[in-house]
Regions:
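Glycine-rich phosphate-binding P-loop
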Residues: 22-40
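Short secondary-structure boundary/capping segments
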Residues: 39-44, 144-149, 299, 348-354, ...
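GTPase G-domain guanine-specificity segment
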Residues: 341-366
Length: 465
């Protein structure tokens, strides 16, 4: 009888144990590394003070334990959890160093199943959770697959106005006199590509998000490769699209076109085939506050980046993405990060603003049966909320330490617009976002957070039942 029970348990193990591959990405400076570090920290401390009341498996005491286990793919770098934790609990505390490529961490979550018929044979089940971190810049490259070199060039040069125009002056000057039909000058093309790369780095440093090609700012082991030595053609109309399209591969225009095509075929498709195709669920982190602080160009750039990014998640039956990759992602969560950097009364506005930014994608995802949600969170709570008296008026405020110098601050950042801001908002400029460093924390206690448990419930809650 005991042998029969053991054999039944082994059979049930194969049927009940589950694997879930969760992808975490976000626009630049959205806090991906802090999010993953905090999520893992909460799960590993479910019996040591973690605050996860919105995760039903914890609330109902069904989650029995969580431990780290070795990852299955030895070719992917390990996510730097311990290093990030040490920085957060450091003296002084600091935000984890951002990751610059794909990394992974794997957890085993042991739980009691409440609704499975198999519970009659087996008391517990295991969810193997693989958390994969990858740069949002790589996701922003996917729409390039629907473009040819000349249409992409038109789009890129069409953005070169305002500050982008100022930052790209060097690139434009280096392109002057470049004959598209002349024999390819590899050294000159490499120098022009380097100038384009410098421009992209400057855009990123200034808080802009729509960066293409994404690998140019995060090259990894591809640094210096010809695949990363191209740039848009500076003026398609001056030469005529038909003439440029006929340039053979040994000309300047032809070589740039060939490298663009190689980048799309090998680099962009390669990432999605090797990684994205295997994702089950996805969370996209968005910092809406810094663009509001920076002004209309930065905010509109974030909006453009999200629009481009959402093309990557366009699940329509006839889309390029569906034809190429047949994705299996069934849940998609958008999170407005740094909820601790605004007062509690503005949290609903943060979520409403993010919903406005991704409205079209939300409608499409619902049509395709994809479960999608938006929420606001703080992976690691860096401030405390309070009330201050200003000229006899009680107003909500935040207390924390400024990121730049650690100075203590008590501030009211202002109101977050609930809808896409119009000119009146920018004229008023009533929003002043401060960047805070992490607060000093007890190393024996889990990291403080805001609604991280709500994100966990959406992303993995149904797999723990």
């Amino acid at each position: 009888m005991k042998r029969l029970k053991n054999e039944l348990n082994a059979l049930v193990n194969r049927g009940v144990d589950r694997h879930l591959r969760l992808a975490v990405t976000g626009l630049s400076r959205s806090g991906k590394t802090a999010f993953i570090t905090a999520m893992v920290n909460q799960l590993l401390n479910i019996h040591a003070g973690a605050r996860l009341p919105l995760l039903s498996a914890v609330r109902e005491e069904c989650l029995l334990g969580v431990k780290r286990i070795p990852q299955r793919d030895f070719g992917i770098p390990r996510f730097t959890y311990d290093e990030g934790l040490a920085q957060l609990y450091g003296d002084p505390p600091a935000w984890p160093t951002p990751t610059r490529g794909v990394s992974e961490i794997r957890l085993a979550l042991r739980f009691k199943s409440n609704d499975s018929l198999l519970r009659h044979f087996k008391d517990t089940s295991t969810l193997y959770l693989e958390i994969v971190d990858y740069p949002g810049e790589w996701l922003l490259d996917l729409p390039m697959l629907a473009q040819d070199y000349l249409s992409w060039s038109r789009q890129m040069t069409g953005l070169l106005n305002g500050q982008r125009g100022e930052w790209s002056v060097k690139w434009r000057m280096m392109c002057e006199g470049l004959d598209p039909l002349a024999p390819a000058d590899e050294n000159r093309l490499a120098d022009i590509a380097a100038a384009w790369t410098d421009y992209l780095h400057h855009c990123k440093q200034q808080g802009l998000h729509f960066i293409q090609p994404g690998r140019f700012v995060l090259p990894g082991d591809m640094a210096g490769a010809p695949a990363l030595q191209f740039s848009p053609w500076p003026d398609v109309d001056a030469w005529g699209e038909s003439k440029l399209a006929q340039a053979d591969k040994h000309t300047n225009a032809g070589m740039l076109r060939e490298r663009f095509n190689y980048y799309c075929e090998k680099v962009v498709k390669g990432f999605y085939k090797n990684h994205f195709l295997r994702f089950d669920r996805q969370i996209v982190l968005v910092d809406c506050l810094q663009p509001l602080n920076s002004g209309p160009q930065a905010f509109n750039d974030m909006r453009l980046a999200l629009t481009q990014l959402m093309q990557s998640f366009h699940y329509g039956q006839r889309t390029l993405f569906r034809r190429l990759f047949s994705p299996v992602i069934d849940k998609l969560l958008f999170a407005a990060t740094k909820a601790d950097h605004v007062t509690i009364d503005q949290h609903a506005n943060m979520v409403s603003l993010l919903q406005q930014l991704i409205q079209d994608a939300w409608q499409n995802a619902a049509f395709e049966g994809i479960s999608m949600d938006c929420l606001g969170l703080a992976s690691v709570q860096a401030t405390t909320s309070g009330i201050i008296d200003v000229n006899g008026e009680k107003i909500p405020a935040l207390r924390g330490n400024r990121l730049s110098d650690g100075a203590p601050l008590t501030v009211y950042p202002g109101e977050v617009p609930a809808r896409l801001p119009g000119q009146a908002f920018w004229d008023k400029q009533g929003f002043q976002f401060e960047a805070f460093r992490p607060q000093v924390m007890d190393v024996d206690k889990p990291l403080p957070h805001i609604r991280l448990d709500a994100a966990l419930e959406f992303l993995i809650g149904d797999k723990l039942r």
